[in-house]
């Protein structure tokens, strides 16, 4: 199982969630181990996804992974953000082994999105006072990536079992 970053940036949507759940259940039915290669920036936003049942389909993915009795190995290749990462074979969902590339990013939210939320007041003040907002945003993004969005932190807190060098 893998995300395809060349198609919709690898996000999970209604159709891909259905496909993931079906594939994991198929592997479990035939006693085949599930190897998940993760590069997922999140779920596809939008009211069309909500009306199509993204919550229900996402729950199918959770159910498929959580109930699978076969060995499950997950490798984070690049991005692993939010609930989409959790359902894609994370430790929280019951994977047996989780690994990551050293350059991978594992967090609730990507650095740029998090900075825009966390530092919105500072960025607004900087804009009002005529400061270089882009430089300040870049500084905050760098700090957030160093402190939060890195695989080393995930290794330290036990979200992954090891790094692939």
Tell me what each language-model feature is.
Residues 1-165:
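Ligand-binding clefts of soluble mixed alpha/beta catalytic domains
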């Amino acid at each position: 199982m893998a995300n395809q970053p060349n198609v919709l940036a690898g996000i999970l949507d209604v159709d891909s969630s259905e496909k993931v759940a079906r594939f994991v259940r198929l592997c479990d039915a035939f006693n085949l181990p599930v190897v998940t290669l993760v590069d997922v920036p999140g779920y596809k936003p939008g009211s069309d996804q909500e009306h199509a049942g993204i919550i229900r389909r996402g729950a199918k993915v959770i159910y498929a992974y959580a109930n699978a009795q076969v060995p499950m190995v997950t490798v984070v290749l690049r991005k692993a953000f939010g609930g989409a990462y959790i359902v894609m074979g994370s430790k929280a969902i019951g994977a047996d082994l989780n690994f990551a590339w050293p350059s991978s990013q594992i967090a609730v939210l990507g650095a740029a999105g998090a900075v825009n939320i966390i530092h919105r007041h500072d960025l607004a003040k900087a804009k009002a006072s005529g400061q270089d907002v882009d430089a300040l945003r870049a500084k905050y993004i760098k700090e957030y990536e160093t402190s939060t969005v890195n695989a080393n932190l995930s290794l330290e807190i036990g979200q992954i079992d090891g790094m692939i060098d």
